[in-house]
Every structure is written in structure tokens, then in C-alpha cells.
Swiss-Prot record:
KO phenotype (gene knockout): Hermaphrodites exhibit sperm-specific sterility and only lay unfertilized eggs. In contrast to wild-type animals, mutant males produce no or few spermatids in their gonads, but instead their gonads accumulate terminally arrested spermatocytes that do not bud and contain four haploid nuclei. In some instances, the spermatocytes have small buds that do not form spermatids. Oocytes and unfertilized eggs contain some larger endocytic structures tethered to yolk granules.
Similarity annotation: Belongs to the STXBP/unc-18/SEC1 family.
GO cellular component: clathrin-coated vesicle; CORVET complex; early endosome membrane; late endosome membrane; lysosomal membrane; lysosome; recycling endosome
Protein name (record): Vacuolar protein sorting-associated protein 33B
Function: Plays a role in vesicle-mediated protein trafficking to lysosomal compartments and in membrane docking/fusion reactions of late endosomes/lysosomes. Believed to act as a component of the putative CORVET endosomal tethering complex which is proposed to be involved in the rab-5-to-rab-7 endosome conversion probably implicating sand-1, and via binding SNAREs and SNARE complexes to mediate tethering and docking events during SNARE-mediated membrane fusion. The CORVET complex is proposed to function as a rab-5 effector to mediate early endosome fusion probably in specific endosome subpopulations.
Source organism (scientific name): Caenorhabditis elegans
Length: 617
């Protein structure tokens, strides 16, 4: 196979997945008669923007496209609109809001809900209890892998303590229906094994076939809970810090106003969204000019996205000086034709690059100013020493308890307590009791359910809780054993951050992401099934061979086929950067796929509130 051919085939594969979803969505619009008003869930705006264009939707009867807002009353039905269509995530809150829309509409108007990814029984019960289930058409549309980058794909699930295995399994069925069975599949974790069993169950009536031109040679399936440590640590790669500080959403980022003050306002981020003049004007402003697309098409960001933040800043300053010199050279051009040629071809691009440089320099400096603060330096040190096992409990927990009263440090407090719970196989009982008392005094006793939920989610727990749930201790021991096997925790060895030699650079040369080390070990030595079964358990290790090549053999990069790594439950940008370095070092194409990209704050908040709906409205 000629170089580059496999890459084209891979891109086309995932592009076809998107085309299938687009056709299904358009088919739904075609089958709904009359003119339509489309309401879109806020978290689905950007994913839908990558699937169907406004012109596609308007050609199929969509007259208006609106935000779906839980806080606002149903709008008056426009006389020109025959049907309202809602594209929403399935949850009870959205279902209850739909009930309000049905109750406000007249009998001759139709309402359709397209659930992404599937119709849930809880939503049906909400409709049924309100007596409106017969007035609503319900459809479901499974989200495909969306390309956030040429090597990074996401199902754009919302953060959840319970990953949606059904929609993930549907995606793998669609992938293999289009391009044949994946030859070799590895999996670690009970959810990974359950996921692949579900894939086989969904294919039972339509047996998948192998194809020689399948562009993916190996698939790695990982459970997020197998290694929660990268979520809890603060890394140092530029793209990862951008996500933690500002949030990258579907490949786009909204920089704060103070970082954009010297950047000209661009076009509407969603030019197909119509904002009613009666609606909140603030929402209108939020969609104007404050987003930047972050991908490899923008050369400057492509050069720094995976760099350590210090190396990124150094590169940006050097690049800015180089751009400025190129602009100043124009003053030495005497020939009018040459000067006109420079203005037409080079000047605009140079000014654009200079603007991007300035924006990223401002972002780098702002993030580094925070990271260099005494609190952050101490936190990095204590996290590292906790993982090494060299920190004293008194020093570690004194630092945490001093920050409990500081509301701005809530994420730091929860993440450090979670790290201690995992590493120490439960926080000492007296220390845990002291933490609970301080936390409730600061935030109020109505937050006691948050701590209960964090305990039930196995995020923060005391040693006494292990007696009631042995699986908590098993998870901690499994992580500790794998961490020792792959030597993921480093000492204080120096590393050139501008030219890193090891994946640990994403955490300041302190720790390598465990899941990435497992992929590296398989590339170097092959899959060690017996060892994984000994450490994790036979019921949590998956190996499937759909080829004559033995699964325990090392992947061969001479085949020009890709390795797909899928993390169920989300991946961090730290791990993405580490896998990209691994791909370069081993000369493999690695497709990084996931349910969503994790942000530490959302990860902790969701697990703190996961069961609180039981006590809520």
C-alpha cells in the first residue's frame, strides 16, 4: 500500500460515519410534513453544526432554528409553522419542558422530539404522567464519532458517572458494517468487555464480515475508571491547560474578553441560529466573535498544542519576532509591483499569524501566572510525592484543609482528596471525618449528599467504607499494581520540555498516563493476556482475533494501518498529547476516540450531584 493511502481511507471511513448520521437526520426532517421550527439542545449545537448545514435543513422545511432553553417559557407558535421539532439529550428535565410546549400548543399542531442518542423510559413516563404521550412523535438518532481533529474523534457525550454503552456499541456496529470487522480487539475493564458483548448482540442478526482493506489493524478499549489519575492531576501541555482554564467545546474555544481585546470580532459562530429580538441579548453577544477554531489547519496552534506550556510560550515569542521581522521587511521593498505582490499575498497572512500569536501568548502567560503561584507549585509537589509514596499524611492533608474555606479552591480540594483515596486505599477515618466536618461548615449541611455521592461514585472515601464495598479496594490495588508494572511514576529526572523523550512530559515529567503506557507496551512487546488476567481478573480482560495473525503479536507499522484507542468514559487532553508523542516515536497512526473529552471540574461536579436528583425536584 502506498504511503498515505491508509490515512485517506481512515479519514473517509469516519467521514462516512458522519454521512450516515447526516442522511438519517435529513430523512427524519423529510418524513415530518409541513414547515418546521427546530429547537436544539445547547450541548448539541456544535455537534449538529458538524453534521448538517443550515442550507440542508432549510431545504427540508426548517424555517427557523432556535436554542432550547429550560429557563424560558414556551414561545408563541408562529402561524407559518406547522410543526416543532426538538433535537435534545434524553433526560427528565427536557421531557418536562416538552410537556409545557405541548400544553401551550393547539390541537392541529404537531410536535416531534429527536432524542440523541436514544429514547429513554424516564422520558416516556414524564409524558405519560402528564397525559401528552399521544401528542408527541418520538425518534432517536445515534451520535457518530465527530472529528475534533484528524486523529481525535468524540461521540460528544455529556459528562456522566454512568457511560452510555448502548450508543457506543451502536457506533462500533456502524463502523464495522461500513468497513468490515476490526482484526484484533483488546479490552481492559468490565465495561469494555460488556461493551464488546453488546456489539456482538447487536450484530447477531447481521453477521459482520472481515475485509482486507479494513484501515484499522488494532482496537484498544479502556474503561476510564481503570485509571482516574490523569483526570485528577493538573498537567502541563498547552491544549490541556486551555481546556481546563477555558473549555474547548467540539474543537472551538471561547477566549475571555480580556484575552481577545486586541483581536477583531469575527463572524457569528453559528450563523444559522436565529436569535429572537425579545430573547436575552446577552446570548446574542456570547455567539459573536468570541470563538476560535482550534485545529491543525491553524499553523501556530498546530505547532504548540502538544507542547509543554513553557516550551509553547518560548516558541510563540520566537514566532512573533520572526513575523514582525517579515512585516518590517516591506519597508525595504522599492519596486511597486513587488510591494503590491507582498501586500496581496503575504501581508494579510502575516497579520493573521501575528494576531494568533498574540492571543496564544496572552493565554499562555495568564495560565502560567496561575500555575507559578505558590499554591500550584506546592500542589504539584504534593501530588507527585503522594504518587511516589514519600509524602507525610500531615503535610498533604494540612495543605488540603487550609484550602477548604477558599471557595475558589474547591476543585483542588476534591481532586487531592480523591487522589489520596485511591493511593492510600481510603483516606484515614479521622482525617475523612475532619474533612467532612470542615466541608459542610463551609458549604452548608445541604451539601452532605454531595459527599455521599462522591463516596458512592468511589471518588472520595474513608478506609472504613472499604469494608462495605470490597470492589473499591480492588480498584486501588489494580491501579497500584499496573502503575508499578509500567513504572509510570517518575522521580525527579530532568527532561528537555522543548523536545520531550517520554510521555510523562504532559505531567511535568512526574507521571506517564497508564492507559498510554499499556498501548506503548503492546506496540513494543505484544499483548500480555496472562499478565493482565492475573492483575485485573479474567472477567475484565478482552481479546478477540478476527484474523490469522495471533493477538499477542506486536502491531506492525509496515502494514500502514492505524491503531484505534477508545476510552469509554472520556479522555483528557494530557493523554491525547501523550498518545500523539507515542505515535511519532513508534511511527504509527493512532486514532484517539472517546465518548467525550474530560474536564476535571465537570468530572467532579457530575459525581458529586449524580444521585442528588433523588432528593431534588
Amino acid at each position: 500500500m502506498a504511503p498515505g493511502t491508509a490515512e485517506l481511507e481512515i479519514d473517509e471511513t469516519l467521514h462516512l460515519l458522519r454521512m450516515v448520521m447526516q442522511r438519517e437526520f435529513i430523512h427524519y426532517l423529510e418524513t415530518l410534513p409541513g414547515t418546521k421550527e427546530l429547537f436544539i439542545d445547547k450541548c448539541l449545537l456544535r455537534p449538529l453544526d458538524m453534521i448538517a448545514t443550515s442550507s440542508d435543513m432549510k431545504r427540508h422545511g426548517v424555517k427557523r432554528i432556535m436554542h432550547f432553553d429550560l429557563q424560558k417559557s414556551p414561545q408563541v407558535w408562529n402561524i407559518e409553522i406547522d410543526q416543532r421539532v426538538f433535537f435534545l439529550r434524553p433526560n427528565v428535565e427536557n421531557a418536562r419542558k416538552i410537556v409545557e410546549y405541548v400544553e401551550e400548543s393547539s390541537e392541529n399542531r404537531s410536535i416531534c422530539v429527536i432524542w440523541c442518542n436514544r429514547q429513554l423510559e424516564e422520558c416516556d413516563l414524564a409524558f405519560e404522567s402528564s397525559g401528552v404521550i399521544g401528542h408527541i412523535t418520538q425518534l432517536s438518532l445515534n451520535m457518530c464519532l465527530l472529528p475534533l481533529e484528524s486523529d481525535l474523534f468524540s461521540l460528544q457525550h455529556v459528562e456522566s458517572a454512568q457511560p452510555d454503552l448502548f450508543s457506543v456499541a451502536n457506533m462500533f456496529v456502524a463502523l464495522q458494517n461500513l468497513y468490515g470487522v476490526i482484526p484484533t480487539v483488546y479490552g481492559l475493564g468490565s465495561e469494555s468487555k460488556n461493551l464488546w458483548n453488546l456489539v456482538h448482540a447487536l450484530c447477531s442478526s447481521n453477521e459482520l464480515r472481515a475485509r482486507p482493506d479494513q484501515p484499522i489493524s488494532h482496537l484498544f478499549l479502556f474503561d476510564r475508571q481503570l485509571d482516574p489519575v490523569p483526570v485528577l492531576l493538573t498537567g502541563a501541555s498547552y491544549e490541556g491547560l486551555l481546556h481546563e482554564f477555558f473549555t474547548i467545546d467540539c474543537g472551538k474555544l471561547a477566549f475571555p474578553v480580556d484575552l481577545r481585546k486586541q483581536v477583531q470580532t469575527g463572524p457569528l459562530d453559528f450563523d444559522w441560529i436565529e436569535i429572537n429580538p425579545e430573547e436575552d441579548k446577552e446570548a446574542h453577544q456570547q455567539n459573536r466573535g468570541d470563538t476560535v477554531k482550534l485545529d491543525n489547519c491553524e499553523d501556530i496552534f498546530a505547532s504548540i498544542r502538544n507542547k509543554h506550556v513553557t516550551a509553547a510560550l518560548e516558541f510563540l515569542h520566537s514566532k512573533a519576532k520572526s513575523i514582525q521581522k517579515s512585516i518590517e521587511k516591506s519597508s525595504m521593498i522599492d519596486d511597486v509591483a513587488d510591494y503590491r505582490n507582498f501586500v496581496e499575498k503575504d501581508l494579510r497572512a502575516l497579520k493573521k499569524d501575528h494576531k494568533h500569536c498574540e492571543l496564544h501568548i496572552n493565554a499562555c502567560e495568564m495560565m502560567m501566572n496561575k500555575v507559578k503561584m505558590e499554591d500550584y507549585r506546592t500542589m504539584f509537589k504534593l501530588e507527585h510525592e503522594m504518587l511516589l509514596g514519600t509524602v507525610t499524611h500531615e503535610e498533604y492533608f494540612d495543605f488540603v484543609f487550609e484550602r477548604v474555606p477558599m471557595r475558589s479552591c474547591r476543585d483542588v480540594v476534591l481532586s487531592m482528596m480523591s487522589l489520596a483515596s485511591l493511593k492510600l486505599d481510603g483516606v484515614p477515618d479521622d482525617t475523612y471525618n475532619e474533612f467532612v466536618e470542615m466541608y459542610l461548615q463551609k458549604y452548608g449541611y445541604e451539601h452532605m449528599f454531595e459527599l455521599q455521592n462522591l463516596r458512592n461514585s468511589r471518588v472520595i472515601y474513608a478506609r472504613r467504607h472499604i469494608a462495605h464495598d470490597r470492589t473499591i479496594s480492588e480498584r486501588a490495588r489494580t491501579w497500584e499494581t499496573l502503575a508499578r508494572k509500567f513504572r509510570i511514576v517518575k522521580g525527579n529526572e530532568p527532561m528537555d520540555m522543548s523536545n520531550p523523550s517520554d510521555m510523562s512530559y504532559v505531567f511535568g515529567a512526574r507521571i506517564s498516563p497508564l492507559l498510554c503506557k499499556i498501548v506503548e507496551d503492546t506496540i513494543d512487546h505484544g499483548w500480555n493476556q496472562a499478565e493482565y488476567e492475573r492483575i485485573i481478573g479474567k472477567d475484565k480482560v478482552l481479546v478477540e482475533e478476527n484474523t490469522y495473525i495471533a493477538a499477542d503479536r506486536r502491531p506492525d507499522n509496515r502494514t500502514r494501518k492505524a491503531i484505534m484507542v477508545f476510552v469509554n468514559g472520556g479522555i483528557t487532553y494530557w493523554e491525547v498529547a501523550a498518545l500523539r508523542l507515542l505515535a511519532i516515536q513508534k511511527n504509527f497512526r493512532i486514532l484517539i476516540c472517546t465518548t467525550h473529552v474530560i474536564k476535571k471540574r465537570e468530572y467532579l461536579e457530575v459525581r458529586a450531584k449524580d444521585a442528588s436528583s433523588v432528593f431534588g425536584s
